[in-house]
A protein has these predicted regions:
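Acidic, proline/glycine-rich low-complexity IDRs
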Residues: 1-4, 75-146
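Long, contiguous N-terminal structural blocks used for assembly/anchoring
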Residues: 1-48
């Protein structure tokens, strides 16, 4: 079983290897809470699902929103599909990948209260290669289809 530190290291490594056009979605198995990443030619975009898309009992609430904002996430707005978001110019340094993973884990663990990485699944594909599936074993998560 993958624990949070191993998952964090694996996620940083896998993000560093994403090709332009890649989309990676990490979602709560059987749920609707997720983190998503999109690699462009010149930036890496990340988002966490916003309250607009969550059932009342799964919403971040004021304290969760405060944690996300303090971590560096930008507040949801209509231009970012009402999700929490952040973007970094690419390429990123290894430390910047670790920093990004750190704020993603604040969302998944502390705000969404996902107990362990085993409660997550992922899907990944490359929009610039005919939506070809990407297999990312370094995540230590089960892969699901689109």
């Amino acid at each position: 079983m993958t624990e949070w530190p191993e998952f964090a290291a694996g996620l940083a490594e896998q993000l560093a290897g994403l090709p332009a056009g890649a989309i990676l979605t990490i979602v709560e198995a059987g749920g609707s809470r997720y983190a998503q990443f999109r690699q462009f030619d010149d930036l890496l975009y990340a988002e966490l699902v916003g309250d607009e898309w969550l059932a009342t009992e799964n919403r971040t609430g004021d304290s969760g929103a405060r944690l996300l904002a303090e971590a560096g996430w930008r507040r949801p707005d209509r231009y970012h599909t009402d999700n929490w978001w952040i973007e970094y110019p690419w390429p990123l340094t290894p430390q910047r990948y670790r920093d990004l993973v750190s704020i993603v884990l604040i969302g998944l663990r502390r705000v969404f209260e996902i107990a362990e990485p085993a409660d997550l699944v992922y899907n990944a594909w490359n929009t610039e290669d005919g939506d070809r599936d990407l297999v990312l074993p370094g995540l230590g998560l089960r892969r699901v289809s689109k």
